[in-house]
Amino acid sequence: MKRMRAIVCGVLAALMLAGCGSGAGVDLTQYAVKEAAYPAYPAAPDYDSYCDRTGTLDWDAYSTALEKYQREMQLLGKGDRPDDGAVRRFADRTVGKIFTGGENTVYSPISLYVALGMLTELTDGETKQQVMDLLGAADAGALRQQIKKLWVSVYQDGDAVCRLANAAFLRENADVKQSAADTLAQWYYASSYRVPMGTEEADRAIASWLNQQTGGLLAEETGNIRTDADNLLRLYNTIYYKAGWWEPFKSSRTKADTFTAADGSEQRADFMHLTETGDVLRGEGYTAAPKSLKCGRMVFVLPDEGVTPESLLARDGFLTELTGEYSMADVVWSVPRFDVKTSVDLKDILKALGVTDAFDGNMADFTPLTDNGAMVNSVMQAARVKIDEEGVEAAAYTEIVANDSSAMIEPPPVVEMNLNRPFLFVIFDGND
């Protein structure tokens, strides 16, 4: 548990069910400025391939294949750990601002962390330093190594999937520096594309890339993306996660029961049931128990009666508490199946956390990207998590939109001088 990172965290205040499909793909090579070269990773052993017709696992063969895979991944840098504490501290600083109560919310700290990391490569001066301070990064070199290690350590592609992806979409006629795209590709595995902002063509290209990277889980949100002709840059990070439980729930034991929301209202939901020996953490105001997945684990936190999830998340260091020492217990699970998705506007949250210059056309410094003025117009994140008897599927994307700063100048006010009632006038000579 010491190295656990919060990939996605959420509060289920009331059940919300939703569904969406994936859109048609678009060939993005026609827009490519710089395409990232991903590491050539070996294929992970497929758990099901080592099971016989009765579902019995050949453990010796599977463990041998898994050890071989892990050795090969370590040679490619998989064992070179990022600073997990830095990511947890960032998550602790941001979750309390995002989970304010009243509604279901899903948030990926890692997705925002990586997106802001890319933003530091495109900014300079105090604009950059404010983002670096929020990320807890000592310098640009350390942050680059951190993000690269994070990308590699998160990566999993086999019977369980966990992967990050990054992209920068630039306005096709914008005067931007090639070095910016080169840096993003080298350190962030980010591809850069030029698209005709403000057109359906650009909207489809961006939505297609996002759908491909998130398994189509957020196609409803990506289908609503509308670029603007003033957009200079649209920066994206995605995370996609899919893994089965090591000990699945049995569908035959799933029963309808009552879920009580924070406001006391009741809803019917399908609850999955299972008893297993596992870890439990008894914390101040809550009980936490992780359920193991084929890639990582999902920690469920049940607040004590009278304690809200939001109050726990607002507590300094709460997510770090969840990496503490657990004890063994027989865990009797009763978990609702759920499918929750949300979109969160992060602009005001980031400003409250000290990132202000990037949003100010007079202060923003985007000289590593362009010699013309630019500023961040909006930052948002969409996320979705589904769990059922078999396992967990989750996806998120963070979007940072930057415009030409000149395009953000407010138009002059309109003042009507309709002299249809008594009025004054004064004539001045030309020396006044």
Q: Regions from the language model: what does each represent?
A:
Residues 1-8:
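Bacterial N-terminal signal peptides that target proteins for export
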Residues 21-23:
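Bacterial signal peptide processing site
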Residues 37, 42, 46-54, 102, ...:
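Non-catalytic, conformational "gating/processing" segments within enzyme and secreted inhibitor domains
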Residues 72-162:
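Post-signal peptide N-terminal segment of secreted/secretory-pathway proteins
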Residues 303-327:
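Internal alpha/beta scaffold segment
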Residues 16-19:
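C-terminal motif of bacterial Sec signal peptides marking the signal peptidase cleavage site
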Residues 25-85:
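N-terminal low-complexity, Pro/Thr/Ser-rich intrinsically disordered segments
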Residues 423-432:
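C-terminal or internal capping secondary-structure element at the end of a domain, subdomain, or sheet
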